[in-house]
Amino acid sequence: MSEERKPLAVVEDRIELAASPEVLWTCFADLSKWPAWFPALVEAKWTSGSPWAIGAQFRQTLKFGFPLGRLTATAVIVEISPSPYVAWEWKVAGMEAIHGYRFDAAVGGTDVLSRHEFYGFPAFLARVFFLTRRMHRIYQAALQGFKAYVETGTIQLRMPM
């Protein structure tokens, strides 16, 4: 994640899953399956570069509901490591975001960290108007959906309010 500047809003969640980091990374790395477990995600597809390589790009369309609406952005992979850890950034409508996921081995499975940093005036407004709480619920639902997808093969597509 970014250490040079301070984000105006941060949303961070963790969840433990009963699978190895390698199994989770294999499931997570299939970008075409993201809409199956991430309720706010409409579409995600690679647009350039080798998947999961620095500089590779993918387009994602998210629906956040009122007042955030629908957002389409091109994400660029900015960091990846074998732990596994991956981070990407996107810029749209005056806001920049850096999203990262880390998969750490734990007793009985893996601890998954989801961290989202937001920069720019829209991020400030989101914090002022308590929209980060809504974003927290959205990303928490994504982790719960990922857990259900990995552990039981079921899909949870309920958008949190």
Residue spans of the language-model regions?
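Short coil-to-beta transition motif at edge beta-strands of beta-rich domains
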Residues: 52-60
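A conserved amphipathic terminal alpha-helix motif
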Residues: 118-161
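Hydrophobic ligand-binding cavity/cleft-lining segments
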Residues: 1-49, 53, 161
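Hydrophobic-ligand binding "helix-grip"
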Residues: 5, 35, 61-113, 117-122, ...
